[in-house]
A protein has these predicted regions:
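Basic, polyanion-binding surface patches
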Residues: 2-184
C-alpha cells in the first residue's frame, strides 16, 4: 500500500511505505511541528459556498502548482468540519489576509470562541465566479473550482483551477512565523 493511501493514524505512527523499496521512518511529530514553525508563510482564509452550505478555515499550507493552466493547492485536515463542506461544494476561494486582519485569521482558525457559522460576520464579503465568499480587504483572492483531492496522511491536498482573481489593496500581507503573526 502506498503512503498516500494509508489512514491518518497509520501515517501518524511514524513509518509508512514509500515509492522507493525501503520504508520511510519519519522524525518525531513534535520536532517536525517545531521545525515547520520556523518557516514563515502567508496567512489565508479559505472559504467555500454551495449546496453543502458555507464555511471557511485559516490556512498557511497554500501554494501555486502551475500557471498553465493556473492551478493552486490547499491542505486541509480531514477532521476539520469544513472538509466535507468544501468537498461537496467543489469550489473554494483563497483569501490572502492583510497584516491588519489577525482577528479574521483567529476567528476562522477557531481561536476566538465564535461559532463557525458566525465567522463571516466580521469583514465585508463579496463573491466572484464560483459564489464563494471573497474578503473585500484581502490582499488577493483566488476563486477556484476543485479539480482533484488527494488524501495524504492526516490531510486532504485540494487542487483548484483558478477561475478568477481579485487583486486587493497593495498592503502588507499577514505572515505566520515562529507561532506568531507578522507582516511582510
Amino acid at each position: 500500500m502506498s503512503w498516500l493511501d494509508q489512514r491518518p493514524d497509520d501515517a501518524m505512527a511514524g513509518a509508512f511505505d514509500a515509492i522507493a523499496p525501503e520504508p520511510v521512518v519519519t522524525v518525531d511529530a513534535a520536532v517536525f511541528r517545531d521545525a515547520m514553525s520556523r518557516l514563515g508563510a502567508a496567512v489565508h482564509v479559505i472559504t467555500t459556498a454551495g449546496k453543502a452550505g458555507h464555511s471557511g478555515f485559516t490556512a498557511t499550507a497554500v501554494c501555486s502548482v502551475s500557471d498553465a493552466p493556473p492551478t493552486l493547492l490547499v491542505c486541509l485536515n480531514r477532521r476539520s468540519q469544513t472538509a466535507p463542506v468544501l468537498q461537496q461544494n467543489g469550489v473554494f476561494c483563497v483569501n490572502t489576509l492583510a497584516a491588519s486582519e489577525t482577528a479574521i485569521a483567529d476567528r476562522f482558525a477557531g481561536r476566538s470562541g465564535v461559532a463557525r457559522d458566525d465567522c463571516f460576520a466580521l469583514g465585508e464579503w463579496t463573491a466572484l465566479t464560483t459564489g464563494c465568499p471573497v474578503l473585500a480587504s484581502s490582499v488577493v483572492a483566488f476563486d477556484c473550482r476543485t479539480i482533484d483531492i488527494k488524501a495524504v496522511a492526516s490531510h486532504n491536498v485540494i487542487f483548484g483551477a483558478v477561475e478568477a482573481v481579485r487583486l486587493g489593496p497593495p498592503e502588507a500581507a499577514l505572515v505566520y512565523h515562529n507561532r506568531a503573526y507578522k507582516q511582510v
